[in-house]
């Protein structure tokens, strides 16, 4: 009897394994029947995964595109991913056929903190997404509300400068600017969510820590998307456990603030509550705004400082541009001054070109059967837009790997650069809704920091490491440390 049961169990296992193999082969055959764009040669089971190591993913894909074409197929195990990298293909995906590519290819693990893909960046396009985006861009991120934030943000920059001075005094003149800028960004995001009068440093500090912790697990989502069987791996299971732990931290942090708030109608919370969304969706939407906005302008400003530490001539030209507009002895650069600072705007653009905050954007998915540059793309296909490759295209940009703000000045080499090749915030239907506030925050921070301090290397002769690390956004692999010298002691 026991032998019969053993044989039966073995037979069942073999039948199950055979069935799974047949399903895999059927799917593989179905995929192979489609004429996908060309790409690097694959290996069984893993596809192209063995070719995606070494550098950060956006850099690896840019190198592969130079060999295999601006429209190529990368196989994440058995999953095809189309990567577009030049002006024409990127513009077709993001703008010309924006609605065709407006769905999202969200990882299952991301649903833990996004209320099952009910946040603005994880949900597919449709009536729900349109309502959510309209509420965000017409309310907290609308021009009237952003204008109201300007005097508050200017005062906050004065606070940042004071705290940097105190930090430097206690540490031999050396600071880590990213920490200060992140805290400023967190305060701004909190005001956009809860209203102008929101002022709660303990809450903001806790949110800052939660976002930093969660950023470390961005690679788990990629692992899941690459391997369908990743869910059975110990590392993935640990990642899921961490996501659930952070979800509880987020809930415990945000829930009491939401419950006690009386938000104005132009705040994000005011809009979310007006739609009668569930508490889970409200908390997910709030946290997403922190996750996407808290690090973006702060990290970009830090990249700019690193570039100018490496090139002191650029820093001096920017300082003189600031002085030309506001004069000597003025401690605060105001938002109204920024548009007059032409070299500042060039530095801002060149930083975003060199180090786009989301170099692969957020992965798109085809909502219908469509085409890209004449090639058929089936519904449900994941499409990555390599903004890093676009911003470093040698057919568009002179010396693309050199930091040259002058390329964006009128009459200089960059005068004829097409706007279609410079897309730091994406384009089309799913362009970043926080684009205007992000540019304002970055420009205001950079102008005030260069006006207040001269920025040099923390250790003489040791320049900042400009290596990328791709988390949810692109950050410096080695966080910047700098020596600051007050310009107006």
From Swiss-Prot:
Cytochrome P450 involved in the biosynthesis of etoposide, a chemotherapeutic compound of the topoisomerase inhibitor family. Catalyzes the conversion of matairesinol to pluviatolide. GO terms for molecular function: heme binding; iron ion binding; monooxygenase activity; oxidoreductase activity, acting on paired donors, with incorporation or reduction of molecular oxygen. The chain crosses the membrane at residues 6-26. GO terms for cellular component: membrane. Pfam families: p450. Pathway: Aromatic compound metabolism; phenylpropanoid biosynthesis. It is a single-pass membrane protein. Combinatorially expression of Sinopodophyllum hexandrum (mayapple) genes of the podophyllotoxin pathway (e.g. DIR, PLR, SDH, CYP719A23, OMT3, CYP71CU1, OMT1, 2-ODD, CYP71BE54 and CYP82D61) in Nicotiana benthamiana (tobacco) results in the production of the chemotherapeutic compound etoposide. One of its GO terms (biological process) is phenylpropanoid biosynthetic process. Heme binds at residue 432. The lineage of its organism: Eukaryota, Viridiplantae, Streptophyta, Embryophyta, Tracheophyta. It catalyses: (-)-matairesinol + reduced [NADPH--hemoprotein reductase] + O2 = (-)-pluviatolide + oxidized [NADPH--hemoprotein reductase] + 2 H2O + H(+). Its EC number is 1.14.19.72. It is an enzyme of class 1 (oxidoreductase). Expressed in leaves, rhizomes and stems. Its cofactor is heme. It is found in: Membrane. InterPro entries: Cyt_P450 (IPR001128), Cyt_P450_E_grp-I (IPR002401), Cyt_P450_sf (IPR036396). SUPFAM superfamilies: Cytochrome P450. Keywords: Heme, Iron, Membrane, Metal-binding, Oxidoreductase, Transmembrane, Transmembrane helix. This is Pluviatolide synthase. It comes from the Eukaryota. Belongs to the cytochrome P450 family. Induction: Transiently induced after wounding.
């Amino acid at each position: 009897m026991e032998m019969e049961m053993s044989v039966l169990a073995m037979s069942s296992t073999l039948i199950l394994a055979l069935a799974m193999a047949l399903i895999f082969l059927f799917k593989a055959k179905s995929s192979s029947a489609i004429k996908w764009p060309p790409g690097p040669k694959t290996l069984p089971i893993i596809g192209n995964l063995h070719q995606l190591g070494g550098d950060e993913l956006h850099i690896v894909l840019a190198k592969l595109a130079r060999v295999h074409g601006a429209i190529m197929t990368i196989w994440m195990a058995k999953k095809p991913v189309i990567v577009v990298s030049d002006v024409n293909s990127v513009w077709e995906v993001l703008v010309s056929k924006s609605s065709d590519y407006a769905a999202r290819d969200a990882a299952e693990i991301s649903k833990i903190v996004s209320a099952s893909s009910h946040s603005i960046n994880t949900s597919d396009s449709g009536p729900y997404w349109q309502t959510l985006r309209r509420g965000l861009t017409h309310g907290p991120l609308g021009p009237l509300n952003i204008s109201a934030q300007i005097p508050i943000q200017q005062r906050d920059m004065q606070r940042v400068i004071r705290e940097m001075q105190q930090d430097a005094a206690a540490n031999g003149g050396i600071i880590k600017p990213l920490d200060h800028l992140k805290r400023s960004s967190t305060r701004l995001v909190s005001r956009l969510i809860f209203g102008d009068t929101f002022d709660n440093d303990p809450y903001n500090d806790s949110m800052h820590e939660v976002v930093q912790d969660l950023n470390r697990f961005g690679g788990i989502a990629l692992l899941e998307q690459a391997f369908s069987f990743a869910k059975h791996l110990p590392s993935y299971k640990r990642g899921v456990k961490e996501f659930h732990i952070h979800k509880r931290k987020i809930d415990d942090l945000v829930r009491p603030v939401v419950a006690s708030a009386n938000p104005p109608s132009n705040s994000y919370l005011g809009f979310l509550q007006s739609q009668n969304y569930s508490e889970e969706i409200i908390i997910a939407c709030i946290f997403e705004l922190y996750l996407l906005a808290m690090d973006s302008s702060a990290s970009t400003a830090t990249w700019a400082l690193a570039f100018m530490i490496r090139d002191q001539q650029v820093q001096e030209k920017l300082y003189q541009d600031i002085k030309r507009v506001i004069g000597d002895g003025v401690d605060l650069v105001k938002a109204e001054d920024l548009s007059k600072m032409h070299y500042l705007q060039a530095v801002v653009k060149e930083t975003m070109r060199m180090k786009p905050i989301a170099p692969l954007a957020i992965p798109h998915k085809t909502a219908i059967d469509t085409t890209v540059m004449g090639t058929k793309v089936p519904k449900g296909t994941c499409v990555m837009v390599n903004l890093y490759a676009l911003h470093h295209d040698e057919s568009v940009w002179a010396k693309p790997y050199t930091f040259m703000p002058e390329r964006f000045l009128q009459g200089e080499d960059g005068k004829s650069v097409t706007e279609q090749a410079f897309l730091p915030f994406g384009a089309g239907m799913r362009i970043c809704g926080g684009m205007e506030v992000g540019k304002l925050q970055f420009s205001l921070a950079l102008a005030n920091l260069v006006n207040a301090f001269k920025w040099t290397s923390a250790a003489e002769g040791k320049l900042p490491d400009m290596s990328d690390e791709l988390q949810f956004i692109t950050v410096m692999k080695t966080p910047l440390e700098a020596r600051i010298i007050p310009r107006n002691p």
